[in-house]
């Protein structure tokens, strides 16, 4: 689902063909570039993905355990739980890429990546993006429109909307799996598009445009909600000082969402523009293609890092999550420490009066 940046790596046969073609003009340049390219693919990327795989398993495993003990009392918590599920599924695709890039799997192992792993990776990445947009809308409604249509605030509406998101993403993804039905050979295995049927190639292109539109829509929603909440808080803080502090926390929360979104997803989608909306990558020379390839893989890695940054959203935005985390780790927040100290002092005073009465 989406452009197979994890798999279609500036097709190796084309890249090596260009290098061998130019080998008569440059004695050591192409070989050096090929070595650097191979080291980046077989060492750097597998190590990076292994790091975020381990980190994501630990962080999201902890998040699953904590959310398991939190009731679905608000739509916000339910959206967060959906993001945890999407992140975990996305994380489980990393080992397949690590094995393939490190060269441990057989040559036909890439067929599994093209047909299944890549589809799951992108499907869950865009599922997370959609739920980040829904969280921003939820924060906007809670702050700016707290007395709006009650149906939009109900947990039932949230569950129905979440199911619709998963169904739509599944409908977009399944044809990419079914229509990747070509017979893998050593000649076509380097390009996932060659493993698709003609209809599969068209469907893949259509889904790529849909995903790009989804990203742009969520980007506009995030920016719009952040600006609207900031302006509303700025106006209300002059009139209702007591309520402004609570609403300012909502503004800080959505600021975390915007920061994670811009850090993880914006660079990748800016880098994929030449691949999505034109054939600019085919018009570039060899060195420019390599630069674009490195940028593409680095920004894709940033997108994958979202599975490690989402737990930050849970901690800063979900009070129930942070309280449960502190409770299980025997760490007290500042407010809890103050309340505990006040309780101890009251009990000491009570004991003193009981003693003096005797």
Curated annotation (Swiss-Prot):
- PROSITE patterns (alphabetical): G_PROTEIN_RECEP_F1_1, G_PROTEIN_RECEP_F1_2
Disulphide-bridged cysteine pairs:
114-192
Domain of life (superkingdom) = Eukaryota
Its main localization is: membrane
Residues that carry a glycan:
4, 25, 33
Q: Please give the record's induction comment.
A: By expression of p53/TP53 and by DNA damage in a TP53-dependent manner.
Membrane side Cytoplasmic: which residues?
69-75, 138-159, 230-256, 319-358
GO biological process per UniProt:
G protein-coupled receptor signaling pathway
GO molecular function terms attached to this record:
G protein-coupled purinergic nucleotide receptor activity
State which residue ranges cross the membrane.
Answer: 48-68, 76-96, 117-137, 160-180, 209-229, 257-277, 298-318
Q: Which residues lie on this side of the membrane: Extracellular?
A: 1-47, 97-116, 181-208, 278-297
Report the subcellular localization: Cell membrane
Kindly state which keywords UniProt assigns to this record, in alphabetical order: Cell membrane, Disulfide bond, G-protein coupled receptor, Glycoprotein, Membrane, Receptor, Transducer, Transmembrane, Transmembrane helix
Q: How does it sit in the membrane?
A: Multi-pass membrane protein
> CDD domains recorded for this chain?
7tmA_GPR87 (cd15969)
Q: What does this protein do?
A: Receptor for lysophosphatidic acid (LPA). Necessary for p53/TP53-dependent survival in response to DNA damage. Promotes the Hippo-YAP signaling pathway and thereby modulates glycolysis and oxidative stress production by the regulation of hexokinase-2/HK2.
The entry sums up its family as follows: Belongs to the G-protein coupled receptor 1 family.
Q: What is this protein called?
A: G-protein coupled receptor 87
* The organism of origin for this protein: Homo sapiens (Human)
Q: What's the gene?
A: GPR87
């Amino acid at each position: 689902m989406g452009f197979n940046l994890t798999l279609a790596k500036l097709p190796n046969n084309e890249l090596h063909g260009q290098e061998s073609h130019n080998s008569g003009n440059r004695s050591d340049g192409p070989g050096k570039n090929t070595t650097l390219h191979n080291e980046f693919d077989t060492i750097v990327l597998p190590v990076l993905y292994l790091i975020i795989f381990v980190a994501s398993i630990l962080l999201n495993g902890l998040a699953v355990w904590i959310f398991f003990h939190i009731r679905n009392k608000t739509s916000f918590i339910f959206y967060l739980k959906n993001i945890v599920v999407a992140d975990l599924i996305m994380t489980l695709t990393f080992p397949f890429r690590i094995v393939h890039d490190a060269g441990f799997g057989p040559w036909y192992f890439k067929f599994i990546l093209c047909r299944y792993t890549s589809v799951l990776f992108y499907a869950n990445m865009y599922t997370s993006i959609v739920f980040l947009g829904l969280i921003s809308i939820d924060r906007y409604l809670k702050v700016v429109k707290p007395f709006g249509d009650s149906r939009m605030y109900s947990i039932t509406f949230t569950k129905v909307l979440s199911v619709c998101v998963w169904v739509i993403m599944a409908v977009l993804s399944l044809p990419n799996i079914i229509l990747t039905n070509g017979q893998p050979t050593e000649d076509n295995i380097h390009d996932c598009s060659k493993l698709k049927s003609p209809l599969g190639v068209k469907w893949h292109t259509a889904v790529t445009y849909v995903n790009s539109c989804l990203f742009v829509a969520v980007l506009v929603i995030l920016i719009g909600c952040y600006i609207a909440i900031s302006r509303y808080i700025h106006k209300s803080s002059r009139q209702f000082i007591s309520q402004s502090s609570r609403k300012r926390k909502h503004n800080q929360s959505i600021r975390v969402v915007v920061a994670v979104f811009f850090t993880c997803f914006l660079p990748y989608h800016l880098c994929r523009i030449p691949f999505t909306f034109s054939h600019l990558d085919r018009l570039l020379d060899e060195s420019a293609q390599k630069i674009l390839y490195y940028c593409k893989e680095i920004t894709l890695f940033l997108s994958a890092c979202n599975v490690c940054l989402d737990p930050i959203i849970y901690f800063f935005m979900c009070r129930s999550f942070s309280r449960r985390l502190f409770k299980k780790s025997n760490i007290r927040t500042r407010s809890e420490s103050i309340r505990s100290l006040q309780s101890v002092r009251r009990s000491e005073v009570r004991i003193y009066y009981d003693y003096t009465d005797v």
